[in-house]
Amino acid sequence: MKTEVLPYTPLMKTIWPQRTLSRDLLLILVGSLFVALTAQIALPLPFTPVPITGQTLGVLLVGAALGSRLGFLALLAYLLEGAMGLPVFAGGTGGIAKILGPTGGFLLAFPLAAGLVGLLVERFGLDRGFFGTLLAMLLGNALLYLVGLPWLAAWLMG
């Protein structure tokens, strides 16, 4: 397979540098399962239908650890698992209705946020220190809000 030349390498490419299809598929599956597990850490809020969950941290960590391409694909797999009805979303829920509901914008932004954090790691090495990691995570979180909040507002108004 073709090798990528990146200024920095994400954690998984350092730990497991040999790139094969089976490795990539396994990392995508593990990444999606990690986010599914972190989604079960949920704190419902009385004033909004969107709970605070651990899955946001999971999304950002998957992006940082797997890189832009595998991070994006892992979160795309996560959305497909949930759309098929597997109980991977917050509160052990799944289904297309969840994606079309108030949390849908946040869910749809997950692959983008993981891809962005992975890109920041690959291009600028922002996972090499505390402040770089903080910046990458804040930018990924900002992207989640940029997509998720307008969706939530439209859902609440409509």
Placement of each model-derived feature along the sequence:
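Short helix-perturbing small/polar motifs within transmembrane alpha-helices
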Residues: 2-17, 23, 37, 96-144
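Membrane-water interface at transmembrane helix exits
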Residues: 39, 43, 81, 117, ...
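Interfacial helix-loop-helix junctions of multi-pass membrane proteins
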Residues: 86-92, 150-158
